[in-house]
Amino acid sequence: MSSSNLYYLSQFKKIATIDDKYNLVRKIGKGATATVYMGYDTSKINGKQVEMYAFKVLKVVNDDILTSFNNEVSILSLLSSEDNSTYYQEHSSKSILYKKNGKKYDIAYIKIEYLSNGELFDYIFYPKKGLGENFSRLIFKSIIDEVIVIHNHNYAHRDLKTENIMLDDSFNVKICDYGFAIKNSNSIQSYCGTNGYLAPELLMNLPFNGQANDIFALGVILFVLVTGTMPFRTASPQDPYYACILRGEYEKFWSGCKCKLSENLMKLIDGMICFNAQERVSIAEIISSEWMKEGEYSEENYKVLKKELSKRKKKIIRKK
Protein backbone atom coordinates (compact mmCIF):
# COMPACT_ATOMS: atom_id res chain seq x y z
CA MET A 1 0.00 0.00 0.00
CA SER A 2 1.42 3.39 -0.99
CA SER A 3 1.85 5.60 2.10
CA SER A 4 1.60 8.74 -0.04
CA ASN A 5 -2.04 8.06 -0.92
CA LEU A 6 -3.18 6.92 2.53
CA TYR A 7 -5.98 9.03 3.97
CA TYR A 8 -8.01 8.95 7.17
CA LEU A 9 -11.55 7.81 6.46
CA SER A 10 -12.91 10.34 8.97
CA GLN A 11 -12.03 13.10 6.45
CA PHE A 12 -14.62 11.90 3.95
CA LYS A 13 -18.27 11.05 3.47
CA LYS A 14 -19.47 8.51 0.92
CA ILE A 15 -21.32 10.09 -2.01
CA ALA A 16 -21.72 7.00 -4.22
CA THR A 17 -20.74 3.35 -4.60
CA ILE A 18 -19.60 1.24 -7.55
CA ASP A 19 -20.82 -2.38 -7.46
CA ASP A 20 -20.85 -2.34 -3.63
CA LYS A 21 -17.07 -2.62 -3.96
CA TYR A 22 -15.76 0.93 -4.18
CA ASN A 23 -16.90 3.92 -2.14
CA LEU A 24 -16.61 7.27 -3.92
CA VAL A 25 -16.00 10.22 -1.60
CA ARG A 26 -15.24 13.28 -3.71
CA LYS A 27 -15.82 14.55 -7.24
CA ILE A 28 -12.45 15.77 -8.55
CA GLY A 29 -13.15 16.43 -12.24
CA LYS A 30 -15.84 16.49 -14.89
CA GLY A 31 -15.65 16.40 -18.69
CA ALA A 32 -18.07 16.09 -21.57
CA THR A 33 -18.59 12.34 -21.16
CA ALA A 34 -16.94 11.37 -17.86
CA THR A 35 -16.77 12.32 -14.21
CA VAL A 36 -13.68 11.59 -12.10
CA TYR A 37 -14.07 10.65 -8.45
CA MET A 38 -11.74 9.98 -5.55
CA GLY A 39 -12.55 6.67 -3.88
CA TYR A 40 -11.34 3.53 -2.17
CA ASP A 41 -11.73 -0.25 -2.09
CA THR A 42 -14.04 -1.18 0.81
CA SER A 43 -12.22 -4.51 1.25
CA LYS A 44 -8.83 -2.89 1.83
CA ILE A 45 -9.32 -0.54 4.75
CA ASN A 46 -6.17 -0.42 6.89
CA GLY A 47 -7.45 0.46 10.34
CA LYS A 48 -8.55 4.09 10.23
CA GLN A 49 -6.76 4.69 6.94
CA VAL A 50 -7.32 3.70 3.35
CA GLU A 51 -5.50 4.08 0.04
CA MET A 52 -7.27 6.38 -2.38
CA TYR A 53 -7.59 5.97 -6.14
CA ALA A 54 -9.19 7.96 -8.93
CA PHE A 55 -12.18 6.52 -10.80
CA LYS A 56 -13.05 7.78 -14.26
CA VAL A 57 -16.78 7.04 -14.55
CA LEU A 58 -18.75 7.12 -17.81
CA LYS A 59 -22.50 6.68 -18.11
CA VAL A 60 -22.92 4.22 -20.97
CA VAL A 61 -25.46 6.01 -23.13
CA ASN A 62 -24.28 5.01 -26.63
CA ASP A 63 -21.83 2.83 -28.54
CA ASP A 64 -19.46 5.73 -29.30
CA ILE A 65 -18.79 6.28 -25.59
CA LEU A 66 -18.12 2.58 -25.09
CA THR A 67 -15.79 2.50 -28.11
CA SER A 68 -13.80 5.45 -26.73
CA PHE A 69 -13.71 3.78 -23.32
CA ASN A 70 -12.40 0.47 -24.69
CA ASN A 71 -9.80 2.34 -26.74
CA GLU A 72 -8.54 4.19 -23.66
CA VAL A 73 -8.39 1.00 -21.60
CA SER A 74 -6.38 -0.79 -24.31
CA ILE A 75 -3.82 2.01 -24.46
CA LEU A 76 -3.53 2.39 -20.67
CA SER A 77 -3.10 -1.35 -20.28
CA LEU A 78 -0.39 -1.44 -22.95
CA LEU A 79 1.55 1.51 -21.54
CA SER A 80 1.32 0.20 -17.97
CA SER A 81 2.38 -3.36 -18.77
CA GLU A 82 5.32 -2.43 -20.97
CA ASP A 83 6.59 0.52 -18.94
CA ASN A 84 6.01 -0.73 -15.38
CA SER A 85 3.63 2.13 -14.62
CA THR A 86 1.28 2.01 -11.62
CA TYR A 87 -1.07 4.60 -13.16
CA TYR A 88 -3.61 2.15 -14.61
CA GLN A 89 -5.18 -0.28 -12.13
CA GLU A 90 -8.30 -1.94 -13.58
CA HIS A 91 -11.54 -1.31 -15.46
CA SER A 92 -15.08 -2.53 -15.97
CA SER A 93 -17.44 -1.85 -18.85
CA LYS A 94 -20.49 -3.30 -17.08
CA SER A 95 -20.90 -1.85 -13.61
CA ILE A 96 -23.53 -0.03 -11.58
CA LEU A 97 -23.15 3.31 -9.84
CA TYR A 98 -25.36 3.71 -6.77
CA LYS A 99 -26.02 7.30 -5.68
CA LYS A 100 -26.97 8.28 -2.13
CA ASN A 101 -30.40 9.39 -3.34
CA GLY A 102 -31.19 5.81 -4.33
CA LYS A 103 -30.73 6.27 -8.08
CA LYS A 104 -28.52 3.85 -9.98
CA TYR A 105 -26.85 4.03 -13.38
CA ASP A 106 -25.18 1.63 -15.82
CA ILE A 107 -21.57 2.77 -16.07
CA ALA A 108 -18.10 1.92 -17.26
CA TYR A 109 -15.14 2.93 -15.12
CA ILE A 110 -11.37 3.03 -15.12
CA LYS A 111 -9.56 2.79 -11.80
CA ILE A 112 -6.30 4.74 -11.89
CA GLU A 113 -3.65 6.09 -9.55
CA TYR A 114 -4.83 9.09 -7.53
CA LEU A 115 -2.52 11.97 -8.46
CA SER A 116 -2.75 14.10 -5.35
CA ASN A 117 -1.18 17.31 -6.66
CA GLY A 118 -3.76 17.79 -9.38
CA GLU A 119 -3.55 19.50 -12.77
CA LEU A 120 -0.45 21.31 -14.00
CA PHE A 121 -2.86 24.00 -15.26
CA ASP A 122 -3.45 25.34 -11.74
CA TYR A 123 0.25 25.89 -11.02
CA ILE A 124 0.79 27.90 -14.20
CA PHE A 125 -1.90 30.49 -13.64
CA TYR A 126 -1.83 31.00 -9.87
CA PRO A 127 -0.53 32.76 -7.81
CA LYS A 128 1.29 34.39 -10.73
CA LYS A 129 1.20 33.79 -14.46
CA GLY A 130 3.82 31.53 -15.97
CA LEU A 131 6.75 29.57 -14.60
CA GLY A 132 9.51 31.30 -16.55
CA GLU A 133 11.96 29.59 -18.88
CA ASN A 134 14.13 27.70 -16.38
CA PHE A 135 11.33 26.00 -14.43
CA SER A 136 9.35 25.41 -17.63
CA ARG A 137 12.31 23.70 -19.27
CA LEU A 138 12.48 21.13 -16.46
CA ILE A 139 8.74 20.42 -16.56
CA PHE A 140 8.69 20.32 -20.35
CA LYS A 141 11.51 17.76 -20.39
CA SER A 142 9.35 15.53 -18.16
CA ILE A 143 6.34 16.03 -20.44
CA ILE A 144 8.43 15.14 -23.49
CA ASP A 145 9.64 11.97 -21.75
CA GLU A 146 6.00 10.93 -21.26
CA VAL A 147 5.09 11.71 -24.88
CA ILE A 148 8.07 9.68 -26.11
CA VAL A 149 6.57 6.60 -24.42
CA ILE A 150 3.23 7.18 -26.18
CA HIS A 151 4.81 7.83 -29.58
CA ASN A 152 7.22 4.90 -29.28
CA HIS A 153 4.17 2.65 -29.08
CA ASN A 154 2.98 4.26 -32.35
CA TYR A 155 0.09 6.14 -30.73
CA ALA A 156 -0.93 9.78 -30.88
CA HIS A 157 -2.60 11.29 -27.80
CA ARG A 158 -4.60 13.97 -29.69
CA ASP A 159 -5.70 15.94 -26.63
CA LEU A 160 -2.50 17.16 -25.02
CA LYS A 161 -3.12 20.24 -22.86
CA THR A 162 -2.14 21.52 -19.42
CA GLU A 163 -5.42 20.21 -17.95
CA ASN A 164 -4.48 16.67 -19.04
CA ILE A 165 -1.07 16.79 -17.41
CA MET A 166 -1.24 15.73 -13.77
CA LEU A 167 1.22 15.82 -10.89
CA ASP A 168 1.67 12.98 -8.41
CA ASP A 169 2.51 13.37 -4.71
CA SER A 170 6.17 14.09 -5.61
CA PHE A 171 5.22 16.55 -8.40
CA ASN A 172 6.23 14.09 -11.10
CA VAL A 173 4.43 14.58 -14.43
CA LYS A 174 1.79 12.10 -15.61
CA ILE A 175 -0.17 12.50 -18.86
CA CYS A 176 -3.79 11.40 -18.54
CA ASP A 177 -7.06 11.13 -20.52
CA TYR A 178 -6.37 8.82 -23.46
CA GLY A 179 -9.97 8.85 -24.72
CA PHE A 180 -8.97 10.42 -28.07
CA ALA A 181 -5.70 8.49 -28.49
CA ILE A 182 -5.32 6.53 -31.71
CA LYS A 183 -2.83 4.44 -33.66
CA ASN A 184 -0.70 6.90 -35.57
CA SER A 185 -0.83 7.28 -39.34
CA ASN A 186 -0.69 10.00 -42.00
CA SER A 187 -4.36 9.61 -42.87
CA ILE A 188 -6.25 10.29 -39.63
CA GLN A 189 -9.44 12.19 -40.39
CA SER A 190 -11.45 12.24 -37.15
CA TYR A 191 -11.70 15.71 -35.62
CA CYS A 192 -11.10 15.95 -31.87
CA GLY A 193 -9.12 17.82 -29.23
CA THR A 194 -9.41 21.15 -27.43
CA ASN A 195 -9.82 24.34 -29.46
CA GLY A 196 -6.89 26.32 -28.07
CA TYR A 197 -4.50 23.49 -28.95
CA LEU A 198 -5.71 22.53 -32.44
CA ALA A 199 -3.26 22.38 -35.34
CA PRO A 200 -4.19 24.01 -38.69
CA GLU A 201 -4.63 20.72 -40.54
CA LEU A 202 -7.58 19.83 -38.28
CA LEU A 203 -9.38 23.05 -39.17
CA MET A 204 -8.87 22.37 -42.87
CA ASN A 205 -10.48 18.91 -42.62
CA LEU A 206 -7.43 17.32 -44.22
CA PRO A 207 -6.03 13.86 -43.38
CA PHE A 208 -3.29 14.39 -40.81
CA ASN A 209 -0.53 12.73 -38.83
CA GLY A 210 -1.59 12.36 -35.20
CA GLN A 211 1.91 12.69 -33.75
CA ALA A 212 2.54 15.90 -35.71
CA ASN A 213 -0.71 17.13 -34.20
CA ASP A 214 0.70 16.30 -30.74
CA ILE A 215 3.83 18.35 -31.53
CA PHE A 216 1.68 21.41 -32.29
CA ALA A 217 -0.16 20.98 -28.97
CA LEU A 218 3.18 20.64 -27.17
CA GLY A 219 4.23 23.98 -28.68
CA VAL A 220 1.13 25.60 -27.21
CA ILE A 221 1.79 23.92 -23.84
CA LEU A 222 5.37 25.23 -23.82
CA PHE A 223 4.21 28.78 -24.55
CA VAL A 224 1.61 28.54 -21.76
CA LEU A 225 4.12 27.07 -19.29
CA VAL A 226 6.52 29.96 -19.71
CA THR A 227 4.12 32.88 -20.03
CA GLY A 228 0.92 31.85 -18.27
CA THR A 229 -1.08 32.96 -21.33
CA MET A 230 -2.38 31.21 -24.44
CA PRO A 231 -0.58 32.04 -27.71
CA PHE A 232 -3.98 32.71 -29.32
CA ARG A 233 -7.55 32.98 -28.05
CA THR A 234 -9.03 30.46 -30.45
CA ALA A 235 -7.85 28.20 -33.28
CA SER A 236 -9.54 30.20 -36.02
CA PRO A 237 -8.49 32.32 -39.02
CA GLN A 238 -10.37 35.18 -37.35
CA ASP A 239 -7.96 35.15 -34.43
CA PRO A 240 -5.10 37.55 -35.34
CA TYR A 241 -2.38 35.46 -33.66
CA TYR A 242 -3.59 32.15 -35.08
CA ALA A 243 -3.88 33.82 -38.49
CA CYS A 244 -0.15 34.63 -38.27
CA ILE A 245 0.56 30.92 -37.84
CA LEU A 246 -1.67 30.04 -40.80
CA ARG A 247 0.30 32.48 -42.97
CA GLY A 248 3.70 31.51 -41.55
CA GLU A 249 4.23 35.08 -40.29
CA TYR A 250 6.09 34.19 -37.10
CA GLU A 251 7.89 37.52 -36.71
CA LYS A 252 4.53 39.28 -36.77
CA PHE A 253 3.20 36.74 -34.26
CA TRP A 254 6.03 37.46 -31.82
CA SER A 255 5.94 41.22 -32.33
CA GLY A 256 2.35 41.20 -31.11
CA CYS A 257 3.16 39.22 -27.97
CA LYS A 258 3.50 41.18 -24.75
CA CYS A 259 5.84 38.60 -23.24
CA LYS A 260 9.57 38.65 -23.94
CA LEU A 261 11.13 35.26 -24.58
CA SER A 262 14.65 34.19 -25.48
CA GLU A 263 15.55 33.77 -29.16
CA ASN A 264 16.19 30.05 -28.73
CA LEU A 265 12.79 29.50 -27.13
CA MET A 266 10.96 31.42 -29.85
CA LYS A 267 12.82 29.42 -32.50
CA LEU A 268 11.78 26.14 -30.86
CA ILE A 269 8.13 27.17 -30.54
CA ASP A 270 8.13 28.34 -34.18
CA GLY A 271 9.22 24.85 -35.21
CA MET A 272 6.54 23.19 -33.10
CA ILE A 273 3.59 25.31 -34.22
CA CYS A 274 4.67 25.40 -37.85
CA PHE A 275 1.70 25.59 -40.23
CA ASN A 276 3.07 22.79 -42.42
CA ALA A 277 2.81 19.60 -40.37
CA GLN A 278 5.54 17.92 -42.43
CA GLU A 279 7.98 20.69 -41.53
CA ARG A 280 7.22 20.64 -37.80
CA VAL A 281 10.12 19.61 -35.60
CA SER A 282 10.25 16.04 -34.34
CA ILE A 283 10.56 14.94 -30.72
CA ALA A 284 14.25 14.23 -31.34
CA GLU A 285 14.73 17.77 -32.70
CA ILE A 286 12.96 19.24 -29.66
CA ILE A 287 15.33 17.39 -27.33
CA SER A 288 18.40 18.47 -29.31
CA SER A 289 17.25 22.10 -29.67
CA GLU A 290 19.49 24.88 -28.35
CA TRP A 291 16.86 25.91 -25.81
CA MET A 292 16.58 22.41 -24.33
CA LYS A 293 20.38 22.07 -24.26
CA GLU A 294 20.59 25.20 -22.11
CA GLY A 295 19.01 23.30 -19.22
CA GLU A 296 20.70 21.51 -16.36
CA TYR A 297 18.48 18.53 -15.58
CA SER A 298 20.10 17.73 -12.25
CA GLU A 299 18.40 16.26 -9.20
CA GLU A 300 19.14 19.48 -7.34
CA ASN A 301 17.38 21.62 -9.94
CA TYR A 302 14.32 19.36 -9.84
CA LYS A 303 14.28 19.76 -6.04
CA VAL A 304 14.19 23.54 -6.49
CA LEU A 305 11.35 23.17 -9.01
CA LYS A 306 9.34 20.97 -6.66
CA LYS A 307 9.86 23.48 -3.85
CA GLU A 308 8.42 26.22 -6.09
CA LEU A 309 5.44 24.04 -7.05
CA SER A 310 4.85 23.20 -3.39
CA LYS A 311 4.77 26.92 -2.54
CA ARG A 312 2.29 27.55 -5.33
CA LYS A 313 0.11 24.66 -4.19
CA LYS A 314 -0.35 26.23 -0.74
CA LYS A 315 -1.62 29.43 -2.35
CA ILE A 316 -3.85 27.48 -4.75
CA ILE A 317 -5.45 25.68 -1.78
CA ARG A 318 -6.04 28.99 0.01
CA LYS A 319 -7.67 30.42 -3.11
CA LYS A 320 -10.02 27.44 -3.45
Predicted regions and their residues:
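Activation segment signature within eukaryotic-like protein kinase domains
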Residues: 139-140
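Conserved short submotifs of the Hanks-type protein kinase catalytic core
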Residues: 105-119
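Conserved N-lobe ATP-binding subsite of Hanks-type protein kinase domains
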Residues: 35
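Catalytic-loop of the protein kinase fold
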Residues: 151-167
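Conserved HxN/HPN-centered segment at the entrance to the catalytic loop
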Residues: 81-99
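Conserved activation segment of eukaryotic-like protein kinases, specifically the C-terminal portion
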Residues: 189-202
